[in-house]
Swiss-Prot record:
Keyword Cell wall biogenesis/degradation listed: no
UniProt organism field: Rickettsia rickettsii (strain Sheila Smith)
Top enzyme category: hydrolase
Enzyme Commission no: 3.2.2.-
Residue intervals passing through the bilayer: none
Gene Ontology MF, one: alkylbase DNA N-glycosylase activity
Record protein name field: Putative 3-methyladenine DNA glycosylase
Length: 183
């Protein structure tokens, strides 16, 4: 049985697209629930019109400016929470949106969509600005799972749709069952 430990801050303090692709297959642990990350999107700096920090630093986007390895949680449409992980060097606003996961404990469940995964896991605005490194209840670990993924345009946005910054698992069949994770 593999012991799940948090990834180091250095993992997140890199190019956002590298982090987004390498998060595919990583394990999200949140308050007793374990899930494999299956879909991510990158939002990178003030030159990305879809990035919340495109217009500069605000109270809402302050967390995006770092340090890396913290959660950025916000509400969309007045009803759904979205989970992001802050990336890049401190002072540069960027984050990876977690769009989909495959829950492996306490049950086997595929959740496609950031709102669905936050609702199931119980993630809300109180989980904004959580340190994912020094935390035993909310973190990302690595069990060595490598999943094939496709790169596509981001979805659910109206600006920056030309960026191929969405990463989604292409075939998860029979891969996740190989791993037994103990948080």
């Amino acid at each position: 049985m593999n012991k799940l430990i948090p990834l180091p801050r250095e993992f997140f303090a890199r190019d956002t697209n590298v982090v987004s692709t390498e998060l595919i297959g990583k394990t999200l642990y949140f308050q007793g629930k374990t899930a494999i990350i299956t879909e991510t999107e990158s939002y990178i700096g003030q030159n990305d019109p879809a990035c919340h920090a495109a217009r500069g630093r605000t109270k809402r986007t302050d967390i995006m400016f770092g340090p890396a390895g913290f959660s950025y949680v916000y509400l969309i449409y007045g009803m759904y929470y979205c989970l992001n992980f802050v990336t890049e060097a401190k002072g540069f606003p960027a984050a990876t949106l977690i769009r989909g996961v495959h829950v492996i404990s306490p049950e086997n469940l595929y959740l496609n969509g950031p709102g669905k995964l936050c609702k199931y896991l119980g993630i809300n605005i109180s989980h904004n600005k959580c340190d994912l490194i020094n935390n035993n209840e909310f973190f990302v670990g690595d069990i060595g799972l490598k999943l094939p993924y496709s790169t596509t345009a981001r979805i659910g946005i109206t600006k920056g749709t030309d960026k191929l910054w969405r990463y989604v698992v292409t075939d998860i069949t029979n891969l996740i069952s190989q791993y037994n994770v103990q948080p």
